[in-house]
């Protein structure tokens, strides 16, 4: 059985959501509705549905993570399907596709989404009628769409990005609706965080990936997302951006390690390479191979190189990484004083030091930069409490190699 989970503080569109469930070919489902707020009246047509279960207890909960957790904890199904109270499932085969994916061993199932703008307009007879229009995201961020027709209405579905550390690191590029968890994967990942007011699904997707669960795409668009002025994603945009940024900073390295294991990519650690006798003065220009590594780590090593060697290291690392592979660099930050902490250090770094490798204008001025990276993070880190207490900070740059692959986020080079 699939348990469809729907919190609601405004049941205005529940009948449409209900219709999208009734029109499914797969009928082994229950609909768990969790009212959250005062004076919530569930439509009679929904209450008459024998597969509906209304769960009390959410009316005094304030965080969406707690409300969704209550819904999942109250569900009877083998898997949980999230359906927002103002959205719809694509009719016919959506639940069947989801069930098939879980039968094949998936722990998390997701689909493409068609977003539509919805508003009431006045027609030529002065009557208020609904208006539906397609909505798409900026192609500058890597988004692609394709046409679909649902209920006779032309819409545009947005193609999900491949599951990578980069796409999972921010809610904007993570799998959109529909999002579904097997019961096993949900609880092994820890379930929804009841402390989160937004981004609860984003954190749970990260935890699910890190738990080792299999992610599986339904193969097409199976969700219709209604966009209007009162969407939570618009009203709480600043809070969402702040939380998703904190998740990106906290979890990117763990996501990279999980991704390496899932795809069999190797990691090259420059400190370990130096321990084998590798000498950048003699061997740097030989490079590290081509499309060979998923992650290259240079932890407090680049400050020991000359400036031209840093440039050649960046070119060589780029060549050695697979498309979309990751480069992590930690260096002392010059303005805190730590950049001159050793008389033998030859290069000095600030937050702008990766600009020649991530921004076209800076690369063009250098003339010998052949690599193309997207900077994901520039973090202030401290190797020890002593460094922190004295304000001696380091910078950790986390970047992805741009080699022509479809890639989430703006590319400046």
PLM regions and their residue ranges:
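Acidic donor-binding loop at a coil-to-helix junction in glycosyltransferase catalytic cores
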Residues: 198-204
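A recurrent flexible, glycine/aromatic-enriched loop bordering the glycosyltransferase active site
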Residues: 139-181
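Catalytic beta-strand/loop signature of glycosyltransferases that borders the donor
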Residues: 112, 215-222
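Short, acidic, metal-binding catalytic loop of nucleotide-sugar glycosyltransferases
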Residues: 19-28
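N-proximal low-complexity "stem/linker" segments adjacent to membrane-targeting elements
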Residues: 1-20
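Glycine-rich, basic loop-to-helix element that forms the pyrophosphate-binding segment
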Residues: 58-75
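Conserved donor NDP-sugar-binding/catalytic core segment of glycosyltransferases
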Residues: 95-148
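Short aromatic/hydrophobic "clamp" motif used to bind/position activated sugar donors
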Residues: 80
